[in-house]
């Protein structure tokens, strides 16, 4: 029997195979799991740079920014400081993507392939955002982690808190992209 909400699972939860890329992109957050995965991929030789991004976050007030928090995790996991690019102003996923692209351009890093490391329930919105902001010829690979919420594609529908989180992502996708759909940059 098919569960009627499998289509939501398919929409929200994205994970692809990972191949070598030019950079590992890490949209900011206040949990260590995404930087731990990025460091793991870095050490396995998947990309020469990690670009964590994010500005101030009251949940990690010990740090000036999500970037500083994530950078410290990376360094503690053996990632060389010069392999960690800096973007410490972003306040949301669109700014994570837009300001990341600016950092890459400023550093003259030509991006053809990128690995996006993010929370599992944030993966569709994060991927769509980076795809809209970055040039269309950039190929994205998505590697997800389970954060402290424990929400995954296999359990999001089992309790109200997890369901609310996933449904919130659907609402955010609608808000983020309603104006992008009719006026996207076109691939020729």
Q: Which residues does each PLM region occupy?
A:
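A conserved mid-domain beta-alpha-beta active-site/ligand-binding segment of alpha/beta enzyme cores
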Residues: 167-188
């Amino acid at each position: 029997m098919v569960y009627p909400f499998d289509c939501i699972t398919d929409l929200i939860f994205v994970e692809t195979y990972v191949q070598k890329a030019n950079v590992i992109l890490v949209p900011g957050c206040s949990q260590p799991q995404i930087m731990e995965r990025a460091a793991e991929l870095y050490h396995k030789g998947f990309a020469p740079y990690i670009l964590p991004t994010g500005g101030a976050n009251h949940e990690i007030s010990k740090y000036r920014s999500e970037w500083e928090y994530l950078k410290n995790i990376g360094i503690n996991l053996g990632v060389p400081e010069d392999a960690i690019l800096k973007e410490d102003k972003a306040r949301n996923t669109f700014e994570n993507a837009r300001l990341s692209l600016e950092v890459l351009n400023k550093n003259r890093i030509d991006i053809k392939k990128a690995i996006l490391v993010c929370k599992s329930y944030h993966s569709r919105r994060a991927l769509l955002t980076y795809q809209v902001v970055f040039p269309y010829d950039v190929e994205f690979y998505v590697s997800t982690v389970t954060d402290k919420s424990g929400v995954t594609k296999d359990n999001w529908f089992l309790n109200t808190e997890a369901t609310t989180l996933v449904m919130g992502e659907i609402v955010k996708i609608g808000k983020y992209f309603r104006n992008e759909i009719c006026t996207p940059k076109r691939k020729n």
